[in-house]
């Protein structure tokens, strides 16, 4: 992943990108256990975040609740954080993020939380320290929106919602 060094505000993590460029991001752990985001493999896109809860929480089918992750982040300007569900929780147990994908702006400094919803048919229990979500740090491009009277033509046109695979 990169180098770690303690700062007064928390932890500063230096992340090396595939292109060899790195960014540093400060993380403050507010959990008793001090859960840090962890990449299981060095090339993983997302870093796992853990449930900062005092006791197990069981989500019944169609039930949702917020989970603290025990961290606050200072995402560098020019980037944003994307919070996604871990694929194993979605595919094996029917858990999803209530907002599908959480966006964390670089100016946000509060606790990172994940609202999980059980869309499965069985109750599922989250235990303290379970890995519940992934944090991705992504470059942010700010577009200038220009209102026009008519959009230019394209090969695809107005086809959408599976139209390119239609027989």
PLM segments and residue spans:
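DUTPase catalytic domain/fold
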Residues: 2-167
């Amino acid at each position: 992943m990169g180098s770690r060094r303690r700062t007064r505000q928390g932890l500063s993590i230096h992340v090396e990108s595939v292109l060899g460029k790195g960014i540093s991001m400060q993380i403050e752990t507010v959990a008793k256990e001090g859960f840090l985001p962890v990449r299981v493999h060095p090339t993983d896109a997302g870093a796992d975040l853990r449930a900062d809860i005092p006791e197990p929480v069981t989500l019944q089918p169609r039930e949702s609740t917020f989970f603290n992750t025990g961290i606050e982040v200072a995402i560098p300007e020019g980037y944003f954080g994307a919070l996604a569900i871990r694929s194993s929780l979605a595919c094996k147990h029917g858990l999803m993020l209530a907002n599908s994908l959480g966006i964390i702006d670089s100016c946000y400094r509060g606790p990172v939380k994940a609202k999980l919803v059980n869309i499965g048919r069985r109750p599922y229990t989250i235990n303290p320290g379970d890995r519940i979500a992934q944090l991705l740090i992504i470059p942010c491009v700010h577009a200038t929106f220009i209102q026009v009277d008519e959009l230019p033509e394209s090969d695809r046109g107005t086809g959408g919602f599976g139209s390119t695979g239609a027989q």
